[in-house]
């Protein structure tokens, strides 16, 4: 397993459309690396393969307090959603910036688990929001895309400042 570099906006690799995984067995190391990378962050709850420069349609999520209950979603799709509300989001690829985004509070997601078994997850509240956020990455979308141009500029200023501080 390896901790991978998390890309930050405006890296063009974050905008790449993910490719469907056809052989789940072939991506087990990537799944492990995504989980290890997620667990190395201070406050991350989800990570998508494009955030580490990979094109596979894979998302990992762990909302548990002890970070020991990973949810692995391969080729996930939101098939339905209801009850939109505004809620604050952040992103490991847009560090140090948080903003209100409108999302469904209840969703149905279909995916494969890490063993290739079909999943259909009906969930609400925070997990529903995180799933939508991470699945957006698979289409090359960031949460700041839902914001006004002014707020997008503010977000990018924060990211540039974060990257300068990190480079020191």
From Swiss-Prot:
GO terms for molecular function: metal ion binding; peptide deformylase activity. This is Peptide deformylase 1. InterPro entries: Peptide_deformylase, Peptide_deformylase_sf. It comes from Vibrio vulnificus (strain YJ016). Removes the formyl group from the N-terminal Met of newly synthesized proteins. Requires at least a dipeptide for an efficient rate of reaction. N-terminal L-methionine is a prerequisite for activity but the enzyme has broad specificity at other positions. Belongs to the polypeptide deformylase family. The keyword Protein biosynthesis applies. Gene3D superfamilies: Peptide deformylase (3.90.45.10). The active site is at residue 134. Its EC number is 3.5.1.88. NCBIfam families: pept_deformyl, PRK00150.1-3. It catalyses: N-terminal N-formyl-L-methionyl-[peptide] + H2O = N-terminal L-methionyl-[peptide] + formate. The keyword Transmembrane does not apply. Fe cation binds at residues 91, 133, 137. The gene is def1. Its cofactor is Fe(2+). One of its GO terms (biological process) is translation. It is an enzyme of class 3 (hydrolase). Keywords: Hydrolase, Iron, Metal-binding, Protein biosynthesis. Binds 1 Fe(2+) ion.
């Amino acid at each position: 397993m390896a901790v991978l570099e998390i890309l930050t906006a405006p890296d063009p690799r974050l905008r790449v459309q993910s490719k469907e995984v056809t052989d789940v067995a072939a991506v087990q190391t990537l799944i492990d690396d995504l989980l290890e990378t997620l667990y190395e962050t201070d406050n991350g709850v989800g990570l998508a393969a494009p955030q580490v420069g990979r094109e596979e349609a894979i998302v990992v999520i762990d909302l548990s307090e002890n970070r020991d209950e990973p949810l692995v979603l391969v080729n996930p799709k939101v098939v339905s959603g209801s009850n939109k509300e505004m809620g604050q989001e952040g992103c490991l690829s847009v560090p140090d910036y948080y903003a209100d985004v409108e999302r469904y509070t209840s969703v149905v997601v279909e995916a494969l688990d890490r063993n290739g078994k079909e999943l259909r997850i009906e969930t609400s509240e925070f997990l529903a929001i995180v799933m939508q956020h991470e699945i957006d990455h698979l289409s090359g979308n960031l949460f700041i895309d839902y914001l006004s141009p002014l707020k997008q500029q503010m977000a990018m200023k924060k990211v540039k400042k974060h990257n300068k501080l990190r480079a020191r």
